[in-house]
């Protein structure tokens, strides 16, 4: 059965495609135009995840394993791909994968099929009812589409004939879907970007962040996006990503509080209140919005601005009030935007010791210096700046072993902020140097065993010698930074494209990169990571450091690659939020088991230590006032309460022996 007439393309087997697909981590970057390539034509037209590169990863795995049978929709999925190469450019930038080969393999597979091999998918009363709400095109129970939602809301190894996928385009349709599902006693769950679901798909939290049967409400079509410069606000639908909002806001010299580029903004508000390095200045939780429209579990539509509703901003705190499922679906929000200043600059302060970096961060945070503030680990810095995983590892090795650069305090602010930082710091890394490191990352990593670094490492203070002394100019000269140099690290056929990408000013503008957040997905290069953490009161430095060390000890206990990710101040420096990252092979069940243990153990120990608002306390409290989530500052729990905590987890996640 021919898929595309008169087109000859490279033959790729399902087996070869699966080798690529297994490395995919569902970061969602293929659904935003972050490199100026445009969007996948197939995904943009058809909507369902199966038509996007991300969804084809799951589709090809199930076809190869014989777990699904081909249907007419598989032909449409195969034919709709134009082999335009957009996905290769996007995915190679972030994860070094080539997903177009997966699409080619599906086309090759379909070409071997006979019409008689196509399975029919019966339409039942539930599907007919859903189609009456959204139209025939936007509701389906076809396994070839359903399978694409595996690992991003549907658990692996589950029966696909138990699901319906529906794509509403309005709040009213979401309400009708929920009422219809309730009428027929069918469970439902909304899906936005699916990143949180993807991260938890390999370990025990999947039981909380997935649907074992029922209706998946894919919110992608709720794409309303309006910028209101006169009030510095924006109206944002549930299908709008952070990148899309930020791009629209920047056209008016405005900025949204952001987390990750591919995250859907409304969902990001609901899930965690937007954890961001800009949060000390712009706020968190209910600070993010003026009003929201939401649909509850009964299908009732409300707004925060409705007169007479119960207090929508108050939250009960403590482990007994942890919730792992949202009680409402935010379908639209009016969110706050903030001015972009003409004199914004980036300045990094390098440190050897975490305590010194944290001390600098708190000084700046409590004085409200800077717009974006964070301590970043050398690992984070290396991952973000490096075009490949190997370069990032060499970059990190040089930072730690030659430069004694283990941490940087990252500051995005005005020139006035820069002056304050430079007065406090012995040495800094400015925008020109950061640009050189981005464009010279391959050459920098190649210095690993050089005489230059050996001599530098023998200095009493390598950081000061390099960044505040004459050796800086020698470093920059040796880097020979250029778009051509970075582009050569990519596959030959993509080098011309990436030379153009790295020639764009924004790709080396650290302030822009902080605002648009397109680099953090490099943490998901062909592997997964889990990032537990939380907020901690900043009144006791030793307590903070002991808390962070606890995460490191747990990582060592389970023999996982791990690193502190970032620390950022909140509430004028009264708190800091810390993310600690554990890296693992998402295809290895044993790794998934270890990750589940680390998550639960670190959360439990955080409750025991006290003065910590854990990530569990954050979940689905994003619409509340931050003061109601962060305060009162919690004391450590007792042994009796530890037992209660485990019982609570077992009621949601199953017995402890399954963790």
Where do the protein language model's features map onto the residues?
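Ferredoxin-type iron-sulfur electron-transfer modules in oxidoreductases and energy-metabolism complexes
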Residues: 2-21, 36, 43-90, 94-121
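Conserved glycine-rich FAD pyrophosphate-binding loop
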Residues: 2-22, 44-55, 156, 160, ...
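Short amphipathic alpha-helix segments
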Residues: 129, 356-393, 543-559, 595-603
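Long, structured ligand/cofactor-binding scaffold of large enzymes
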Residues: 151-255, 268-277
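C-terminal cap/substrate-recognition region of VAO/PCMH-type FAD-linked oxidoreductases
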Residues: 334, 345-352, 361-504
């Amino acid at each position: 059965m021919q898929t595309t007439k008169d087109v000859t393309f490279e033959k790729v087997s399902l087996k070869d495609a699966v080798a690529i697909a297994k490395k995919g981590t569902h970061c969602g970057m293929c659904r935003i135009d972050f490199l100026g390539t445009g969007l996948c034509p197939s995904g943009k037209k058809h909507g369902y995840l199966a038509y996007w590169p991300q969804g084809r990863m799951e589709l090809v795995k199930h076809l190869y394993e014989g777990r699904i049978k081909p249907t007419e929709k598989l032909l449409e999925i195969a034919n709709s791909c134009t082999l335009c190469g957009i996905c290769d450019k996007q995915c190679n930038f972030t994860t070094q994968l080539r997903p177009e080969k997966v699409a080619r393999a599906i086309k090759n597979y379909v070409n071997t099929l006979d019409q008689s091999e196509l399975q029919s998918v019966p339409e039942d009363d539930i599907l007919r009812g859903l189609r009456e709400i959204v139209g025939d095109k936007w509701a389906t129970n076809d396994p070839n589409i359903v399978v694409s939602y595996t690992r991003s809301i549907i658990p692996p190894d589950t029966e696909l004939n138990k699901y319906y996928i529906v794509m509403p385009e309005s709040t009213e349709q979401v309400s009708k879907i929920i009422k219809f599902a309730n009428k027929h006693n069918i469970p439902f769950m909304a899906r936005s970007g699916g990143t949180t679901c993807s991260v938890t798909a390999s370990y025990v939290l999947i039981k909380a962040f997935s649907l074992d049967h029922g209706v998946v409400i894919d919110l992608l079509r709720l794409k309303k996006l309006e910028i209101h410069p006169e009030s510095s606000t924006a109206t944002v639908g549930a299908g709008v990503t952070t990148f899309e909002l930020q791009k629209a806001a920047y056209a008016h010299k405005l900025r949204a509080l952001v987390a990750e580029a591919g995250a859907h903004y409304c969902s990001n508000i609901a899930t965690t209140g937007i954890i961001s390095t800009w949060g000390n200045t712009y706020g968190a939780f209910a600070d993010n919005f003026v009003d929201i429209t939401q649909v509850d579990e009964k299908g009732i539509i409300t707004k925060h601005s409705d007169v007479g509703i119960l207090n929508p901003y108050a939250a009960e705190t403590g482990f007994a009030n942890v919730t792992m499922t949202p009680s409402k679906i935010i379908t639209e929000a009016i969110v706050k935007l903030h001015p972009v200043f003409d004199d914004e600059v980036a300045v990094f302060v390098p440190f050897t010791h975490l305590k010194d970096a944290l001390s600098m961060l708190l000084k700046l945070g409590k004085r409200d210096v800077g717009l974006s503030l964070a301590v970043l680990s050398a690992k984070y810095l290396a991952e973000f700046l490096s075009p490949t995983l190997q370069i990032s590892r060499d970059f990190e090795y040089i930072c730690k072993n030659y430069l004694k650069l283990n941490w940087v305090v990252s500051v995005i602010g005005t020139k006035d902020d820069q002056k304050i930082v430079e007065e406090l710091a012995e040495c800094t890394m400015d925008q020109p140097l950061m640009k050189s490191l981005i464009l010279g990352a391959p050459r920098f990593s190649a210095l690993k065993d050089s005489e230059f670094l050996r001599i530098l490492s023998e200095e009493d203070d390598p950081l000061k010698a390099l960044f505040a002394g004459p050796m800086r100019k020698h470093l920059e000269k040796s880097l020979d930074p250029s778009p051509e140099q970075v582009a050569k690290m990519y596959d030959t056929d993509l080098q011309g494209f990436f030379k153009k990408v790295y020639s764009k000013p924004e790709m080396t503008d650290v302030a822009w990169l902080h605002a648009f957040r397109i680099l953090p997905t490099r943490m998901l290069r062909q592997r997964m990571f889990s990032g537990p953490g939380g907020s901690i009161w900043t009144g006791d430095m030793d307590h903070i450091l002991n808390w962070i060390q606890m995460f490191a000890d747990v990582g060592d206990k389970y023999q996982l690659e791990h690193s502190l990710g970032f620390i950022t101040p909140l509430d004028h420096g009264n708190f800091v939020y810390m993310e600690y990252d554990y890296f693992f092979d998402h295809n290895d069940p044993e790794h998934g088991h270890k990750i589940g243990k680390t998550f639960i153990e670190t959360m439990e120990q955080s409750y025991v230590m006290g003065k910590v608002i854990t990530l569990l306390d954050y979940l689905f409290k994003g619409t509340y006032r931050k003061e109601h989530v962060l305060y009162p500052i919690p004391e450590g729990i007792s042994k009796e309460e530890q037992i209660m905590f485990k019982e609570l987890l077992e009621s949601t996640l199953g017995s402890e022996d399954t963790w």
